[in-house]
Each structure stands twice: as structure tokens, then as C-alpha cells.
Amino acid sequence: MGVTKKPDLNDPVLRAKLAKGMGHNYYGEPAWPNDLLYIFPVVILGTIACNVGLAILEPSMLGEPADPFATPLEILPEWYFFPVFQILRTVPNKLLGVLLMVSVPSGLLTVPFLENVNKFQNPFRRPVATTVFLIGTVVALWLGIGATLPIDKSLTLGLF
């Protein structure tokens, strides 16, 4: 059983802290050993038991066996590679495509330095960084959606 510290309400320091709403450290149950030795292992073992139980009751299906001689008509990367895949697919020159791919992380590295003299954290008070972020997000979404379309409709997204 843990040792609890009983608050002395006649103490002027405690009364001042309670008046400010800072007296929560003077009463209650200590974290050691009650929480760390008894409650946390129960929560961790319960989480592991739930995961194992779900894995046993609902195993993931493997799907159909792989056929190395049957390739899909159009091979697409994972969804988070769609914008880069679209850049490589639409740019005719390989060197220019690689340079554009390198410009993505280098452009992201320059965003914090656009308004580093600005002391505000509110995005509405940092218009240049916010505009660069919004334009980058729109371009990434445009490239990502375009990568899922055929090559003749990919740049206009089939709208024009």
C-alpha cells in the first residue's frame, strides 16, 4: 500500500497554492508504486491480449497466390508515391524528372526559412509561409490525383 501525504490545511503556503489552483500535488495517490507496478502492466497485458485475441479470431487472408507470368496492365505505386510518380511520368527528360524530384524535399527544407524573422506562430500572421504551404498542398493533391488517371488526362484531370 502506498504512502499518501495528508494535506495540512492550516499551512499558509498550501492555502496560497490552493487559492491559485496549484494544490493538486499535496494529496492523492502516488504514482509509484501503485500506478507503475499494478495498473500499467494490467493495461499493457490487456492490450496485448486483445491484439492476440483479434489475430486468432479474425486472421488476415493471404489472397490469391502470386503468378509471376501475369503482370497487371498498369503498375501503380503506393498512394504516397503518386505525386512523384506523376512527375516522372509526365516529364520527358529523365534528368529533369530527377531534378524535379530532388526539388521537392529541398523546397520543403526552405519553407521554415521563408519567414524566420517573423516571431508569430499563427499561420494567419505568416502569409508567405502559409501561401507556400497551401500551394504545395494543392500541387501535391493535383499530381496525386493525376497519377491515377490515364496519361492523356493526367495533367488536366480530365476537366478540359
Swiss-Prot record:
GO terms for cellular component: chloroplast thylakoid membrane. It comes from the Eukaryota. One of its GO terms (biological process) is photosynthetic electron transport chain. The chain crosses the membrane at residues 36-56, 95-115, 131-151. It is found in: Plastid, Chloroplast thylakoid membrane. Its main location: plastid. The 4 large subunits of the cytochrome b6-f complex are cytochrome b6, subunit IV (17 kDa polypeptide, petD), cytochrome f and the Rieske protein, while the 4 small subunits are petG, petL, petM and petN. The complex functions as a dimer. Belongs to the cytochrome b family. PetD subfamily. This is Cytochrome b6-f complex subunit 4. It comes from Oenothera elata subsp. hookeri. The gene is petD.
